[in-house]
């Protein structure tokens, strides 16, 4: 038993340590000359053969011998017990006990002192070498216990031969039995694999997968469409020379599926006679190269592979990612797989289908014209949306079986259409299949959830189990009560779960075929992937969209034209009426400073996209020099910053549904506008790495102060004239400013914008409304410090008088509030005259000075309640 345990422990170690032990035991130096021999000794040993050698060493230790001879190997073969060798010896009536007795009779026991590493005798080394030869003769690329026994018998001399003779075994009979059992084993594995008789293609079976066999067993997904490509592949395969098609297409368009489609056609017999009876075998290049540590080993594998294919004449080799052939196995002057295969590929000895992407084909295969001419390119285009829908319908059944649910026709159409429209950096049908798969997973998880009541009971059950374990050793009465409650809870949980199962069973019996994946599930997955709202407009959201102007006006005072234009654009996009190949909308806001151009963009981002951070803001004053354009799309290769992410394209890739604000657009270098032409017209831009970024779901807003001087000169009367005069003055100024814009920006840039919106100068009444908003923000900040602030109407008038300047908009108002109110407040707060919990009133005295009073020491002219009624909520 001790021997067995030691062996099982040792078996857990790596083959490398075993190889080292064998090398040491055989006293073979680790130089170059010995590598091939030593590799042959231990690299190909099966687990059972390793176990035999370990057992042989244990037997040597048990007998106290300082060597492993043929007799110890024989004892190891018998002791292993499960291999072919052990079974044959057992059938001959040879057991471990008798064999040990015979060995002890012949060589006796040793001195008792045994070295850690026990060496092999020259005869034992000879047995190992002969076992390798026996394996080669049988066409095996491994050494098992049966090969060790054959090597032992072939040696014919030594203690082991005498032991077998003494036990009455006939070596030739043993050899016959071993070869017969090896043949039977091969027949069984060959029949299971679908071959006939012995294993004629061990290398192909080891490094390849038979797609035709998988197709016969129905394990491949159905291939829908792609008839022209499959026909062209069959046509090329039927050529006399250079009969090697190479499938070239973008990732995810279905190149591997074409090879699977060919395998399915061959399996079903629907194929031309030139390809009838063929086998499509896909080669695993990683597995082929794995473990080839020694020079020439990789080449040897490839040559064996080619020989097997030539002999068979019915193999079509499929190499996915065919560019991996180039450089595979090439180390220190060794030739790579591509160069080994070239002669066979040109002469038509090898039928090979390759598959690779356009980029990899250009990067690797086109650089080697000798390899390129041997492959006939077959372009695999991306399927259209209609073709993708047909593909999804073909795959529907497989996914329904996997997820245990049903897909509606609408959900499949939505998966194809929405993936085409919104997931721009991937290709059909891959992105549509992924949508369909994840939607199925989501629906299944939603229906598999435990009922809420059962979850609560399970939570209580865990708590009681924990308490029960804590009190079990001390308070038996409490432990008993807890145990009873635990049993009750378990029964309740089981009852709820059983009820759920009965309900689902009843549903299936009444014809309800389980959960359904609908269009809304697909829409939800698209939203979670991209952040784009594609669900149908709900009732709540339609109210939100209809009241958009009203909500935006709470933050942006005046500027009706701009607010209406933005609201119209958002409604068009959400209802689905916008052009799908252009951005949601593109505006340029121009007008005097401080009238709400940037504020409107921020308000829109906060209101509709959730938060102000949802906006991508680019301050164009940072792009005043020509070379700074590279910040937007990335530096070209070879320049500093090539590895850094571009500011614009990367931000839009991360968040494709957003507002992009180009602030102070006229400050940028004119070359920046050239880059923006494609964004405005086609909704796309290519970054420095060649990746196309989609701007079709962005709202582009540019702000500019061009024409401020014209507005200031011609617009002094805006806000003070009668209504009809107001409009005529506004239109007159707009035409003047548009003329100035045309002088500054190129016509092709202005022509691509949806609308150019002039912001009006603010009137005094509008400035007063803005003052209410700014004061309300200050009240909110002070509330967090538990200070209640009120201002009188007189103070408010003073702030508006000081803060109103038609040329500068609302910004002077902020400075006036800072100077008149915030400065007075901070002095009082630092002097501890105003503390937490105080109610403060700010007024203006008869001399025009600002006074700050605590609630008890003065009476405000406007109470807080009255004030809040008159203030819009921020």
Curated annotation (Swiss-Prot):
One of its GO terms (cellular component) is chloroplast. It is found in: Plastid, Chloroplast. Residues 45-110 are annotated as: Repeat 1. ATP binds at residues 249-256, 591-598. Residues 120-184 are annotated as: Repeat 2. Residues 42-184 form the Clp R domain. Residues 458-492 form the UVR domain. Belongs to the ClpA/ClpB family. This is ATP-dependent Clp protease ATP-binding subunit ClpA homolog, chloroplastic.
């Amino acid at each position: 038993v001790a021997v067995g345990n030691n062996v099982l422990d040792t078996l857990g170690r790596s083959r490398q340590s075993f190889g080292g032990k064998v090398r040491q035991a055989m006293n073979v130096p680790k130089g170059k000359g010995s590598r091939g021999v030593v590799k042959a000794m231990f690299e190909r040993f099966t687990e059972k053969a390793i176990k035999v050698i370990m057992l042989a060493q244990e037997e040597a230790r048990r007998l106290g011998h300082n060597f492993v001879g043929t007799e110890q190997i024989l004892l190891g073969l018998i002791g292993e017990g499960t291999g072919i060798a052990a079974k044959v010896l057992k059938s001959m009536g040879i057991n471990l006990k008798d064999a040990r007795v015979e060995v002890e009779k012949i060589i006796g026991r040793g001195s008792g002192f045994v070295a850690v590493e026990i060496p092999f005798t020259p005869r034992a080394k000879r047995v190992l070498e002969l076992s390798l030869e026996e394996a080669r003769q049988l066409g095996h690329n491994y050494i098992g216990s049966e090969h060790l026994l054959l090597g032992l018998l072939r040696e014919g001399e030594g203690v082991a031969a005498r032991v077998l003779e003494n036990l009455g075994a006939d070596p030739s009979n043993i050899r016959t039995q071993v070869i017969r059992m090896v043949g039977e084993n091969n027949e069984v594995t060959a029949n299971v694999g679908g071959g006939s008789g012995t294993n004629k293609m061990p290398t192909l079976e080891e490094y390849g997968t038979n797609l035709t066999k998988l197709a016969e067993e129905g394990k491949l997904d159905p291939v829908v469409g792609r008839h022209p490509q499959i026909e062209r592949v069959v046509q090329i395969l039927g050529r006399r020379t250079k009969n090697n098609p190479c499938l070239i297409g973008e990732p995810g368009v279905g190149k591997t599926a074409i090879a699977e489609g060919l395998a399915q056609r061959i399996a079903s017999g629907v194929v031309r006679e030139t390809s009838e009876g063929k086998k499509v075998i896909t080669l695993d290049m990683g597995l082929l190269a794995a473990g080839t540590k020694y020079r020439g080993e990789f080449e040897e594998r490839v040559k064996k592979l080619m020989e097997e294919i030539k002999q068979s004449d019915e193999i079509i080799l499929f190499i996915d990612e065919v560019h991996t052939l180039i450089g595979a196995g090439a180390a220190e002057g060794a030739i790579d797989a591509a160069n080994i295969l070239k002669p066979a590929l040109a002469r038509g000895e090898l039928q090979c289908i390759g598959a690779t992407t356009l980029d990899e084909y250009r990067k690797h295969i086109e650089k080697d014209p000798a390899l390129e001419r041997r492959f006939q390119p077959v372009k695999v285009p991306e399927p259209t949306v209609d073709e993708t829908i047909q593909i999804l319908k073909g795959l529907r059944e497989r996914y329904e079986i996997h997820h245990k649910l049903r897909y509606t026709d609408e959900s499949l159409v939505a998966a194809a259409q929405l993936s085409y429209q919104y997931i721009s950096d991937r290709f059909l049908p891959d992105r549509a299949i992924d949508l369909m798969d994840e939607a199925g997973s989501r629906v299944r998880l939603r229906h598999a959830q435990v009922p809420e009541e059962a979850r609560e009971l399970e939570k209580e059950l865990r708590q009681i189990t924990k308490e029960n374990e804590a009190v079990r050793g001390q308070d038996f009465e409490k432990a008993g009560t807890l145990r009873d409650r635990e049993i009750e809870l378990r029964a309740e949980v089981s009852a709820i779960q059983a009820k759920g199962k009965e309900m689902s069973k009843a549903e299936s019996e009444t014809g309800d075929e389980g959960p359904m994946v609908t269009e809304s599930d697909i829409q939800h997955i698209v939203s979670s992937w991209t952040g784009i709202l594609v669900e149908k407009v709900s009732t709540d959201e339609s109210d939100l969209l209809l009241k958009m102007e009203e909500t935006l006006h709470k933050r942006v005072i005046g500027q009706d034209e701009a607010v209406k234009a933005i609201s119209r654009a958002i409604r068009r996009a959400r209802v689905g009426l916008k052009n799908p190949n252009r951005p949601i909308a593109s505006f340029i806001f121009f007008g005097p400073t401080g009238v709400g151009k940037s504020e409107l963009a921020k308000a829109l981002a906060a209101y509709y996209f959730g938060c102000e951070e949802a906006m991508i803001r680019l301050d164009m004053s940072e792009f005043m020099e020509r070379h700074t354009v590279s910040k937007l799309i990335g530096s070209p290769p070879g320049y500093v910053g090539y590895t850094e992410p571009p500011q614009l394209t990367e931000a839009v890739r991360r968040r494709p549904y957003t507002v992009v604000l180009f602030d102070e657009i006229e400050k940028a270098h004119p070359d920046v506008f050239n880059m923006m032409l494609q964004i405005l017209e086609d909704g796309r831009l290519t970054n420095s790495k060649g990746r196309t970024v989609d701007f079709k779901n962005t709202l582009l807003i540019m702000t500019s102060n061009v024409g401020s001087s014209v507005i200031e000169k011609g617009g002094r009367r805006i806000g003070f004239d009668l209504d009809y005069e107001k409009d005529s003055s506004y239109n007159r100024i707009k035409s003047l400013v548009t003329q100035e814009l045309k002088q500054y920006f190129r016509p092709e840039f202005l022509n691509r914008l949806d609308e150019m919106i002039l912001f009006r100068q603010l009137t005094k009444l509008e400035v007063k409304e803005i003052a209410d908003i700014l004061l309300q923000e200050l009240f909110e900040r002070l509330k967090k410090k538990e200070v209640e602030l009120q201002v009188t109407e007189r103070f408010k008038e003073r702030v508006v008088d000081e803060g109103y300047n038609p040329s500068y908009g609302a910004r002077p108002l902020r400075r006036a509030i800072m100077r008149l109110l915030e400065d007075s407040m901070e002095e009082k707060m630092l002097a501890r005259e105003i503390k937490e919990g105080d109610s403060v009133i700010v007024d203006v005295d008869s001399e025009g000075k600002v006074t700050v009073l605590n609630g008890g020491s003065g009476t405000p002219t406007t109470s807080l309640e009255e004030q809040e009624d008159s203030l819009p909520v921020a």
